[in-house]
A protein has these predicted regions:
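Class II aminoacyl-tRNA synthetase catalytic cores and aaRS-like
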Residues: 1-199
């Protein structure tokens, strides 16, 4: 046999983790000869599609071939190597926007000149939140090892979105417009910024 599938019970005798099934569970064991990565994808993706289509209780399942994301792109856009693509929030690299002459945020420019990058994370429908909401996020970021978070609140003024908040005054109108376009921002959104060396 050059290949076979085997569905069998598995007894896990090791420490449990959040992404592991504890104790007994069923697994699909695959043995294949003389294959490469693409052969594995072509064999497995239809099985997963049929499995979740038949037993997914009516939930929508992506059709093969499944979307593939490079590790570096996944870490940049989602902050994890196993993202939940149902979550619409993405992380954006806005380093080049911070280099603009009409952005006067000198602390970021200084860090960028030393090799740092700037990432931005939108927070939909949060611009009307109280100051304590933003302070809590900032404190959390510091607890996680970041130097802090800058943020801009987007509000509509005469049919145009404008940037408010602690660092909004350092951005010219054209720079705000580019942020809105690049980061897919809308009215009442907040955009958080973090600047540090890439890790």
């Amino acid at each position: 046999f050059d290949k076979y599938f085997q569905i069998a019970p598995c007894f896990r005798d090791e420490d449990s983790r959040a992404d592991r099934s504890p104790g007994e569970h069923y697994q699909l064991d695959i043995e294949m000869s003389f294959v490469e990565q693409e052969d594995i994808f072509k064999s497995i993706e239809p099985i997963f599609f049929e499995l979740f289509t038949q037993f997914g209780k009516g939930k929508v399942v992506s059709k093969p071939p499944f979307q593939r994301i490079k590790y570096k792109d996944s870490m940049l856009k989602y902050g994890t190597d196993k993202p939940d693509l149902r979550n619409p929030i993405e992380i954006f690299d806005v380093t080049e926007i911070m280099r603009r002459e009409d952005v006067k945020l000198d602390i970021f420019k200084k860090l960028i000149s030393k090799g740092s990058i700037v990432r931005a994370i939108p927070a939909p429908n949060t611009s009307s939140k109280p100051r304590s909401f933003f302070d809590e996020f900032n404190n959390w970021a510091k607890d996680e090892g970041a130097k802090g978070l800058g943020y801009i609140l987007l509000e509509k003024n005469k049919e145009k979105l404008t940037g408010k908040g602690p660092i909004g005054k350092f951005f010219a109108k054209k720079a705000i417009e580019e942020l809105i376009k690049v980061c897919k921002l809308r009215e009442n959104d907040t955009i958080f910024f973090s600047c540090d060396t890439e890790k």
